[in-house]
Amino acid sequence: REACKSILPLRQCSVSAAELMDRNALRAVENEPGMPETLRTLPDGAVALLIDTSADDEVTLQKQFAEIAEKLSDVQTLYPVSFTTDPELYATYWRVRSGLFTSAAAGRPRGTVSIIEDIAFRGDVLGDALTDVREVLARHRYPDAVMWGHLLDGNVHFTIFPDINRPEGVEGYAAFMQELTDTVLRHDGSLKAEHGTGRNMAPFVRQEWGEDIYRLMKDIKKLLDPRNLLNPGVLINDDPQVFIKNLKKMPLANDLIDRCI
């Protein structure tokens, strides 16, 4: 919640990226070669914010550093806001960001699958919304879920590791998706942001947009694709159970294969 207070101030600065990474995301990469030592010292509940800014000259760049630090002065941090112009150091920081999903998914419990989704919220509610989403994840026994996102856009990704080899695992996942939908919509958020609506989220489009708009979507689909040849069932799908059908299970094989995503 505290980290999300930075979204509105950062939008007033010359910032090209502000990447949010939760503690589970950082934990997934903290033991990789070249990772900053500070990652291993972070407490549970901590998050990191990777800010990228650039300029054509050193004077302008230093001014931008100062402006960003000033805008974030009201945000409580575990470590002081700091910047670097060392190419090797900032490349290390970006390796943290780029490697977190694959590292987290490869380290998931054996026999589970990795399911990734992305949601979005307005900047003024992002902190409260993500806190609630994290509570939903915990209630549905996904405490190891990994969360990261593009803070400036209010867009957050998360990946969970359900065991769909068991019927109760599928039932638990279905219950989670419904409560996730309810939580996102309660905060006036979007069930999709950066990526398209696939079969996993299709059953919840009607709830998100309401009957009238959903009916209009279906009319447009029928008009432009009367034979339903283009991505059938991906966005418009009247089967409320489609997201838990034809799931690709992950039987145990060997230690190497079980890490595949």
Tell me the role of every PLM-derived stretch.
Residues R1-A193, T197-I261:
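Noncatalytic alpha-helical scaffold of FAD-dependent oxidoreductases
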